[in-house]
């Protein structure tokens, strides 16, 4: 993607996260980026403490704010050591400099290259913000999440489902 993106900020949407929102999640992140004069912005939502080991979890300057500067991010931490309950969902607006950090990432949690590791290594030089987006997120990477999304959107379109 780097040759296509060039020197422009860009959005990333992970396919297993489906969002129903009053305005697009990427649009919300872009608006926050513009309001702050630049920087990367990552969508987050609060999760139950026992669920932190299923997500990338961020640490921020102020957990009470809708948008706050990130200070750290860890992939799937044990609930006992999670820095917050703010979980990353699959929506991002990045500055192009993030590619420089992603190119240096090695295999991480689960034997995979983790986007989280690239973000973590960029935090000292690329201003990065966590934003609690407005809307509902469905994890369509799980059977239950896919079913929940299907029922939600069917009901929203007027289908009667018990």
Language model feature labels by segment:
Residues 11, 30, 34-35, 62-161:
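Catalytic-core segments of class I nucleotidyltransferases/pyrophosphorylases
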């Amino acid at each position: 993607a780097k040759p296509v993106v060039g020197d422009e900020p860009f959005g990333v949407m992970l396919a297993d996260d489906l969002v129903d929102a009053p305005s697009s999640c990427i649009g919300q992140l872009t608006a926050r980026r513009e309001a702050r004069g630049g920087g990367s912005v990552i969508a987050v939502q609060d999760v139950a403490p026992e669920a932190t080991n299923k997500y990338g979890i961020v640490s921020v300057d102020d957990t009470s704010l809708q948008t706050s500067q990130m200070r750290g991010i860890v992939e799937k931490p044990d609930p006992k050591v999670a820095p917050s309950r703010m979980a990353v969902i699959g929506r991002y607006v990045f500055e192009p400099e993030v590619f420089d950090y992603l190119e240096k990432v090695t295999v991480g949690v689960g034997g995979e290259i983790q986007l989280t590791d690239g973000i973590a290594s960029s935090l000292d030089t690329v201003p990065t913000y966590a934003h609690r987006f407005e809307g509902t997120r469905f994890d369509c990477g799980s059977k239950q999440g896919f079913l929940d999304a299907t029922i939600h959107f069917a009901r929203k379109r007027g289908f009667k489902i018990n």
